[in-house]
């Protein structure tokens, strides 16, 4: 029994933190946090970006070929925006640990996204937004939601 407990405890750190949001649940949270029309981008843009970046999963991580990693519901990159302790030359422009972006509480992700979108490139900073959302009817992502 004791060895089983030790085995279980060994695997606990491997469990991904975070939450998979529902579409409307995420839209409501993002609206509460001031993303609707932030820097001219409607709420639908943000929900669409989250869908194609992480499939609404706050615990999502993706390693890039340059050695950096994208974190959280909006896949914020460790080269520029957060510190994961393993990306050489990280700028950490949001002044946060990347682990904060994996929380079920999306406050850190939203606050950092506001800095990113204000940096000059707007939402073009997100590849998935450029590929799947830009120039499309993003209102479909909030249609039917009680906001």
Swiss-Prot record:
UniProt entry keywords in alphabetical sequence: Antimicrobial, Bacteriolytic enzyme, Disulfide bond, Glycosidase, Hydrolase, Secreted, Signal
Pfam families: Lys
The reaction(s) this protein catalyses: Hydrolysis of (1->4)-beta-linkages between N-acetylmuramic acid and N-acetyl-D-glucosamine residues in a peptidoglycan and between N-acetyl-D-glucosamine residues in chitodextrins
InterPro entries: Glyco_hydro_22, Glyco_hydro_22_CS, Glyco_hydro_22_lys, Lysozyme-like_dom_sf
Signal peptide limits: 1-17
A Gene Ontology molecular function term of the record: lysozyme activity
Modified how: By an evolutionary shift in the site of proteolytic cleavage of prelysozyme, Gly-18 became the N-terminal residue of the mature protein instead of being the C-terminal residue of the signal sequence as in other birds.
Entry's localization field: Secreted
Disulfide-linked positions: 24-145, 48-133, 82-98, 94-112
EC number of this enzyme: 3.2.1.17
Residues the record marks as active site: 53, 70
Residue stretches making up the C-type lysozyme domain: 19-147
Gene Ontology cellular component terms for the protein in this record: extracellular region
Keyword Signal carried by entry: yes
One example of a Gene Ontology biological process annotation: defense response to Gram-positive bacterium
SUPFAM superfamilies named in the record: Lysozyme-like
Record text on subunit structure and interactions: Monomer.
PANTHER family to which the protein is assigned, alphabetical: LYSOZYME C (PTHR11407:SF28)
Additional notes on this entry: Lysozyme C is capable of both hydrolysis and transglycosylation; it also shows a slight esterase activity. It acts rapidly on both peptide-substituted and unsubstituted peptidoglycan, and slowly on chitin oligosaccharides.
Family under the similarity heading: Belongs to the glycosyl hydrolase 22 family.
Designated name of the protein: Lysozyme C
């Amino acid at each position: 029994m004791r060895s089983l407990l030790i085995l279980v405890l060994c695997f606990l750190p491997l469990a991904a933190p975070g939450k998979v949001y529902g579409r409307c649940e995420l839209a409501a949270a993002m609206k509460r946090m001031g993303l609707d029309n932030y820097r001219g981008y409607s709420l639908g843009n943000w929900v669409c970006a989250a869908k194609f970046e992480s499939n609404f999963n706050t615990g999502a991580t993706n390693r890039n070929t340059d050695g950096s990693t994208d974190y959280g519901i909006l896949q914020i990159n460790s080269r520029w925006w957060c510190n994961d302790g393993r990306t050489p030359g990280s700028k950490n422009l949001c002044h946060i640990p990347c682990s904060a972006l994996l929380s079920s509480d999306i406050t850190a992700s939203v606050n950092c996204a506001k800095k990113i979108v204000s940096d000059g490139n707007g939402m073009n900073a997100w590849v998935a937004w450029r590929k799947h959302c830009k120039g499309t009817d993003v209102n479909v992502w909030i249609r039917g939601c009680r906001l």
